[in-house]
Amino acid sequence: MDIAIQHPWFKRALGPFYPSRLFDQFFGEGLFEYDLLPFLSSTISPYYRQSLFRTVLDSGISEVRSDRDKFVIYLDVKHFSPEDLTVKVLEDSVEIHGKHSERQDDHGYISREFHRRYRLPSNVDQSALSCSLSADGMLTFSGPKVPSGVDTSHSERAIPVSREEKPSSAPSS
């Protein structure tokens, strides 16, 4: 078995380039000691190995894509059901709110809540917006784009979240 040896000076020199989970959206998941004291963990031992970091898309960070034909938002909401999610269009933005009451998990009781707001491009057809939640917890909000001269604005309205039985086909960056 090969064990990589990491010298403490190497990690400290590259400390600003190592990702930290402290400000990521790990809903209900615990922090590791290197999230709070990243430089201290490398001075403990040169043989110390960190846990594996998640990829950017697995970390709950949303992805916004604005192509020529459509506008799409992908958001990882795996801890929420469609009943826990509210999606509203307010003039030129979309608000996604998720909240579930306290429930028991492996480590005790937990309640979660988040609120996200995204600006919609001016040429998105707000009457054709859709929102779906895949089986693996990926929320997909999408709307087609129209030519520039068409009026696309509408008043405030809620977008229903439909449930898909298959995992998300969200492209990874």
UniProtKB/Swiss-Prot annotation:
UniProt-annotated location(s): Cytoplasm; Nucleus
TM spans (from-to): none
GO molecular function, a single term: structural constituent of eye lens
Residues the entry annotates as binding Zn(2+) 1: H100, E102
Keywords: Acetylation, Chaperone, Cytoplasm, Eye lens protein, Glycoprotein, Metal-binding, Methylation, Nucleus, Phosphoprotein, Zinc
GO cellular component, one term: nucleus
This protein's name: Alpha-crystallin A chain
